[in-house]
């Protein structure tokens, strides 16, 4: 097989990355026949600005996620049904799984860890909210450019000054990521983290910033532009009035802990989780905060030790030996994982409150390091303790098949609105919105009595739910006309 180039990677008989792509497509194949759900109606179906290129261009001045909206527009023009949207999302996820493999391989110098990490990234059902749920494209498409930019940056030569062609290409992908979703502004910080963990030479911050100059210029320019658009300023002002800083941080901490548990408790996956707004300390929140502090402190200690070790090693190397020997991969993995996770969640889970405290799609990129830590533990245990790699592969295959089975089952729930919202109210029985949406799904299906019961339940939970009250009146009228 002749080698070909993808972001500067020569692939000769590269079965593993293509196996990952095939697996990703396989587990999401049944998602192609899913329908529009939840926010898809406001974002796509009932949004005229994504129904034609002219309308998209007229709306371009809003400055909000225009590249994402362009993909919606092109999908809509190809056919105003959900099939094409699902194909696009599935391709994005397959590409991301491919990129995760190569980034993990560059980070760990270990193809086995890279393969297992990318495999579980591809098949784990927590990703369905970013793949099967059409509006989750904001996360998966942004990740294509974000990870692509990072991978292109790894090709930058340390002696290239301003980054060379790969630096420019990386910066271009960064710009595309910003035009897809604003949280991608964290990329320059991720580049610094990558250098600190992966660089084979002692860190010279001035040289590093020079290589990243275009990224930081885009970062500063984008922040400036965002504040010029009234939509962004109105959104920020609205968000800041939702809850206090203390209440938001405590609620987010609890929400992060709850969502992380979904990586193991696969039956708890939920498109509309009922997470409480926490305004005061409790024993549970205190334990969660203490655990977070321990993890962050360990990450800082590990990263500082890693940087110091590189510096000390460089001092004793012969002058003609410019590259530091490859460090132990496990401290690198741990340090990178802790700070990557923090960097990815800072925009959505810290200072600016959101109506929904947290959603599973916010973990699409952050979850990479959860799979990385899991894969590293698997390899370490079976390679160095049990010393049985065949047993490891059997374990990996069984777990991947189990996760893939849950993903296929989760995709099936997205097949229609009734199935999705029946699943949601089982998992969030005290949240009025789920019952209102279930009632509307029943109403559209002509099941007016079921719709009335669902609306009544929503009003029982929240008597001030105006939309449910209006929908109930509409359901009563439709029921009488039968």
Task: Annotate each predicted stretch with a short phrase.
Residues 2-476, 480:
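Polytopic membrane enzymes that build or remodel cell-surface glycoconjugates and lipids
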């Amino acid at each position: 097989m002749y080698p070909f180039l993808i972001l500067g990677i020569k692939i000769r008989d590269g079965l593993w990355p293509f196996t990952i792509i095939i697996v990703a497509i396989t587990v999401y194949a049944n998602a192609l026949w899913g329908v529009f759900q939840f926010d898809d109606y406001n974002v796509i179906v009932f949004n005229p600005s994504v129904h034609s290129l002219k309308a998209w261009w007229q709306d371009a001045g809003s400055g909000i996620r225009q590249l994402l909206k362009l993909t919606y527009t092109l999908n809509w023009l190809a056919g105003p049904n959900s099939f094409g949207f699902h194909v696009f999302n599935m391709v994005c996820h397959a590409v991301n799984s491919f990129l995760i493999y190569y980034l993990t391989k560059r980070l760990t110098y270990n193809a086995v860890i890279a393969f297992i990490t990318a495999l579980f990234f591809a098949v784990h059902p927590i990703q369905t909210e970013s793949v099967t749920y059409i509006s989750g494209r904001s996360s998966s498409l942004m990740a294509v450019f974000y990870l692509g930019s990072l991978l292109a940056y790894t090709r930058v030569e340390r002696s290239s000054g301003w980054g060379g062609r790969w630096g420019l290409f990386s910066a271009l992908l960064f710009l595309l990521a910003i035009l897809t979703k604003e949280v991608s502004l964290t990329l320059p910080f991720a580049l610094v983290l990558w250098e600190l963990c992966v660089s084979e030479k002692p860190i010279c911050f001035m040289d590093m910033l020079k290589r990243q100059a275009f990224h930081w210029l885009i970062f500063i320019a984008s922040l400036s532009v965002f504040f010029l658009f009234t939509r962004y300023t109105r959104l920020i002002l609205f968000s800041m009035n939702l809850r206090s800083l203390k209440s938001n941080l405590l609620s987010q901490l609890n929400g992060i802990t709850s969502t992380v548990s979904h990586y193991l408790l696969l039956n708890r996956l939920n498109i509309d989780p009922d997470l409480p707004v926490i305004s005061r300390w409790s024993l549970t929140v205190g334990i969660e905060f203490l655990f977070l502090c321990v993890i962050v402190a360990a990450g800082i200690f590990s990263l500082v030790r890693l940087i110091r070790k590189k510096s000390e090693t460089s001092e004793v190397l012969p002058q003609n030996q410019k590259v530091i020997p490859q460090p132990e991969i496990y401290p690198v993995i741990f340090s990178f994982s802790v700070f990557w996770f923090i960097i990815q969640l800072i925009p959505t889970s810290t200072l600016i409150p959101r109506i929904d405290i947290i959603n599973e799609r916010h973990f699409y990129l952050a979850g990479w390091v959860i799979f990385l830590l899991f894969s590293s533990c698997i390899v370490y245990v079976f390679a160095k303790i049990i010393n049985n790699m065949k047993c490891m592969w059997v374990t990996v295959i069984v777990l991947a098949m189990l996760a893939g089975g849950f993903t296929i089952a989760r995709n099936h729930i997205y097949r229609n609105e009734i199935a999705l919202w029946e699943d949601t109210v089982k998992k969030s029985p005290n949240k009025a919105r789920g019952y209102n949406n279930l009632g509307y799904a029943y109403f559209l299906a002509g099941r007016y009595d079921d719709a009335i019961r669902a609306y009544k339940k929503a009003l029982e939970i929240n008597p001030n739910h105006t939309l449910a009250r209006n929908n109930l009146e509409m359901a009563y009228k439709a029921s009488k006309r039968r």
